[in-house]
């Protein structure tokens, strides 16, 4: 997966074989200079396997990705990794949503949209990053393959 907002960041999933854990390698995040295509740095994501679906918040300060045990958040330099959602997802998107705080004030919230790849693959969950809670569920007629906003 790749994020390119102000810099090119590449998420490498490593090797993950659920039947042979001795061959597994941890995932990593690399920063590539977009002008000369040289590696600026690479950081191993400790105890993270099969990382995929890298997305960024609008300010490029926080990154989110899926891995074998759920959805994770990290700083844009690969530090401070924490698990946000503890079920396996293979779809991940972010969105900023507005809402009325009162008659004259509009608030904004960063949302993650994920699926449950194993338990309910026809369901999309909306997760509010500010409150760390699920705030909506969308059920569709078939397995979720992708999420797009228009």
Each model region followed by its residue ranges:
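Repeated scaffold domains used in trafficking and secretory/extracellular systems
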Residues: 1-5, 47-58, 90-104, 142-150
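Conserved beta-propeller blade signature
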Residues: 7-11, 61-65, 106-114
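Short loop/turn segments immediately following the C-termini of beta-strands
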Residues: 13-16, 66-69, 115-119
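Short, solvent-exposed loop/turn segments at conserved positions within beta-propeller repeat blades
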Residues: 17-27, 117-121
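A short beta-strand motif characteristic of beta-propeller blades
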Residues: 38-46, 80-92, 133-139
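Blade-level signature of beta-propeller repeat domains, shared across WD40, Kelch, NHL, RCC1
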Residues: 117-150
């Amino acid at each position: 997966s790749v994020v390119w907002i102000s810099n090119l960041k590449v998420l490498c999933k490593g090797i993950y074989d659920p039947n042979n854990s001795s061959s597994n390698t941890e995932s990593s995040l690399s920063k590539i200079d977009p002008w000369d295509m040289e590696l600026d740095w690479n950081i191993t994501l400790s105890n993270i396997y099969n990382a995929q679906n890298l997305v960024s918040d609008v300010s490029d300060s926080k990154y989110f990705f899926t891995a074998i045990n759920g959805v994770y958040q990290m700083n844009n330099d690969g530090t401070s990794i924490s698990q946000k959602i503890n079920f396996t997802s293979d779809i991940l998107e972010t969105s900023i949503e507005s809402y009325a705080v009162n008659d004259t004030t509009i608030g904004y919230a960063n949302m993650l949209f994920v699926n449950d790849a194993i338990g309910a693959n026809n369901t999309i969950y909306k997760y509010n990053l500010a409150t760390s809670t699920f705030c909506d569920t969308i059920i569709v007629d078939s397995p979720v393959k992708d999420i797009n906003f228009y």
